[in-house]
C-alpha cells in the first residue's frame, strides 16, 4: 500500500522565489530564442512548450538549477521516506492561469517525488 506525505517548509521562501524567477526568465529566454530563430524549434535544451500533459506550457527536464534543488532536498526526502534514495531526474513546469494537470500515473522512477 502506498502512503503519501507532505513535508511543510522543505524549501525556504528565498529558494522558492529564486526558482520561480529563474524559471520565468528561462521561459522568456526560450520564447526569444524561438522568435529570433536562434535555436531549432525542436530542441529541448532550453525547455519545451510541447509537454503532452499540459500543452503550451513551459517545462524543462534536467535543468542544472532544478537538479541542484533536487540534490538539496534529498536528505529531507530520505528522512521522510526512511530510506536511502537515488535522484533520477528533475522536471519543472511553469503553470499559467487555466492550466490543468489531470490525474495521471508517473513512471516507476517517480515512485518517490518532490
Residue map of PLM features:
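Non-heme Fe(II)/2-oxoglutarate
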Residues: 1-81
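Conserved double-stranded beta-helix
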Residues: 70-113
Amino acid at each position: 500500500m502506498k502512503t503519501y506525505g507532505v513535508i511543510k517548509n522543505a524549501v525556504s521562501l528565498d529558494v522558492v522565489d529564486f526558482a520561480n524567477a529563474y524559471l520565468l526568465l528561462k521561459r522568456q529566454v526560450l520564447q526569444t530564442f524561438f522568435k529570433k530563430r536562434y535555436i531549432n524549434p525542436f530542441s529541448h535544451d532550453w525547455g519545451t512548450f510541447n509537454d503532452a500533459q499540459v500543452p503550451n506550457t513551459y517545462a524543462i527536464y534536467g535543468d542544472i538549477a532544478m537538479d541542484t534543488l533536487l540534490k538539496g532536498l534529498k536528505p529531507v526526502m530520505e528522512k521522510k521516506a526512511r530510506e536511502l534514495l537515488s535522484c533520477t531526474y528533475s522536471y519543472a513546469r511553469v503553470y499559467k492561469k487555466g492550466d490543468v494537470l489531470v490525474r495521471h500515473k508517473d513512471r516507476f522512477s517517480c515512485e518517490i517525488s518532490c
